[in-house]
């Protein structure tokens, strides 16, 4: 991590983009799964 930190400034924006993509997919997925599970329990 220390190696190529200031030598590779292109690696920084990619990490941010990846973080946004992962969270953009993971948060709604977890919310959807939670909502479905809640409905299953509320149904009965």
From Swiss-Prot:
Localization annotation: Plastid, Chloroplast thylakoid membrane
InterPro entries according to UniProt: PSII_cyt_b559_bsu, PSII_cyt_b559_CS, PSII_cyt_b559_N
Membrane topology: Single-pass membrane protein
Required cofactor(s): heme b
Record keywords, A-Z: Chloroplast, Electron transport, Heme, Iron, Membrane, Metal-binding, Photosynthesis, Photosystem II, Plastid, Thylakoid, Transmembrane, Transmembrane helix, Transport
Free-text remark on how the cofactor is bound: With its partner (PsbE) binds heme. PSII binds additional chlorophylls, carotenoids and specific lipids.
Residue numbers binding heme: 23
DNA repair in keyword set: no
Cellular component annotations (GO), alphabetically ordered: chloroplast thylakoid membrane; photosystem II reaction center
BP GO terms, sorted: photosynthetic electron transport chain
Family indicated by similarity: Belongs to the PsbE/PsbF family.
Function (record text): This b-type cytochrome is tightly associated with the reaction center of photosystem II (PSII). PSII is a light-driven water:plastoquinone oxidoreductase that uses light energy to abstract electrons from H(2)O, generating O(2) and a proton gradient subsequently used for ATP formation. It consists of a core antenna complex that captures photons, and an electron transfer chain that converts photonic excitation into a charge separation.
Subunit structure: Heterodimer of an alpha subunit and a beta subunit. PSII is composed of 1 copy each of membrane proteins PsbA, PsbB, PsbC, PsbD, PsbE, PsbF, PsbH, PsbI, PsbJ, PsbK, PsbL, PsbM, PsbT, PsbX, PsbY, PsbZ, Psb30/Ycf12, at least 3 peripheral proteins of the oxygen-evolving complex and a large number of cofactors. It forms dimeric complexes.
Protein name: Cytochrome b559 subunit beta
């Amino acid at each position: 991590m220390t190696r190529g930190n200031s030598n590779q400034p292109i690696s920084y924006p990619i990490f941010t983009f990846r973080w946004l993509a992962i969270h953009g997919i993971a948060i709604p997925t977890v919310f959807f799964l939670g909502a479905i599970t809640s409905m299953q329990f509320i149904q009965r």
